[in-house]
């Protein structure tokens, strides 16, 4: 079809005025976050040498009538009566089902240009259409979107995923066919958001299978594609209420697969960004299904090494849940402590930041449920030899809300934190950490000098007791080593000695 048509057209190409004007445009329908789909530069332009009207007159004799009977796809919507516009729309959709190879930019360049112009015509029509789309239009649209968008990424494409490790800064791989794909995505966004689309009819064609394949595309290496998909997914979630439970379940399965199996996925941040808007729309009281999503999906998402890539979006989702139901705060903190990255200092800094955000909104009752294990962990962070971890833990005392919670529960918290502060004062190598430690000690002293002094006395007593035990243990082993040095290497039966040899045993050996 394409060859028969284009063989009658000159091969020379030039810039089309209309295409150039539209290239700088953008999709006016934003997503839940308001981000439009930006158009990049043109793939090319329509062939020159013949006027557009000449091409339209010729194409009716070249394209088979099976496209849509009596409708030639390159005719402008302005040139057909209103009764035929939807038939022309379907004809143009069928024309756009041709997919081209973009690995060679010079291959089929004229055909690519015609498809691009046709996609722009379709976008303009959806923008301006006021009549309800027929079922034939919806079916043809769904088919065209599927043909152009749905594809499987090759294994080597996924192996360079940015979600595979910590701190990776690899350049993303950009989709060579983007100049067509971006227009297909823009058309899909406008089509789903159009008031002309009846959701009751559309749900049959934008079904579970379509949604799953759309979600699979979020593993694309191209950030432009993921951004478009994020916007479209939000629009589908808002348009088709009947699909909402399925979308939540399908996204949960992606998260499960990522956390517990592959540890690799490019679109986790985008999915979480969509769900941030979804969570903010949850009705109160929260359903048990939604709480399970928090405990079994969002909290375990702190486990992967690549959590830094999507931590901002994840923290937003978690805090949205806590704002909806403050009683969830303590269980979230306990979950974070369960996944605490003891051997990963960078993640520890991130976790401390998220903990502080949660403490901003936590109630006193929920704080009291988790404060002991929480501040034991914070005390360990204060003593960390990694200065960034110690610094971030001490920065928590700059938060007025946290100070208020600590002051109300100082009888439990001071005995946990003061020993860590004293340990820092005596042993830490970093001057900035030492300065922050002194500031926190001064704050505790002003908060409750009697309690602070009592904690210091107890710390000193514990240190003296520990030093005494250490001295006795060292002396015991020195005696044991001395006794062993006078014994022959062979000739005597071995004696089983416990961890701490008794005084009688040592006397016998001597």
UniProtKB/Swiss-Prot annotation:
Domain of life: Eukaryota
Keywords associated with the record: Cell membrane, Cytoplasm, Membrane, Phosphoprotein, Stress response
Protein's cellular compartments: Cytoplasm, Cytosol; Cell membrane
Listed result of changing residue 493 to A: No effect on salt-induced B'KAPPA protein accumulation
InterPro entries: ARM-like, ARM-type_fold, PP2A_B56
Effect of residue 502 to A: Abolishes salt-induced B'KAPPA protein accumulation
Function: B regulatory subunit of phosphatase 2A (PP2A) involved in salt stress response. Under salt stress conditions, required for the catalytic activity of PP2A and the dephosphorylation of SIT1, a negative regulator of salt tolerance. Dephosphorylation of SIT1 turns off salt-induced SIT1 activity directly, which has a positive effect on salt tolerance.
Family: Belongs to the phosphatase 2A regulatory subunit B56 family.
Name listed for the protein in its UniProt record: Serine/threonine protein phosphatase 2A 57 kDa regulatory subunit B' kappa isoform
CC terms in the record's Gene Ontology section: cytosol; plasma membrane; protein phosphatase type 2A complex
Tissue expression summary: Expressed in root stele and epidermal cells.
PTM per Swiss-Prot/TrEMBL: Phosphorylated at Thr-476, Thr-493, Ser-502 and Thr-508 by SIT1.
Compositional bias of kind Polar residues: 25-51
Membrane topology: Peripheral membrane protein
Phosphoserine: residues bearing it: 502
Induction: Induced by salt stress (at protein level).
Region: Disordered, residue numbers: 1-51
GO terms under biological process: meiotic sister chromatid cohesion; positive regulation of response to salt stress; signal transduction
GO terms of molecular function: protein phosphatase activator activity; protein phosphatase regulator activity
Residue(s) carrying Phosphothreonine: 476, 493, 508
Disruption phenotype: No visible phenotype under normal growth conditions, but mutant plants exhibit increased sensitivity to salt stress.
Record text on subunit structure and interactions: PP2A consists of a common heteromeric enzyme, composed of a catalytic subunit (subunits C), a constant regulatory subunit (subunit A), and a variety of regulatory subunits such as subunits B (the R2/B/PR55/B55, R3/B''/PR72/PR130/PR59 and R5/B'/B56 families). Interacts with SIT1.
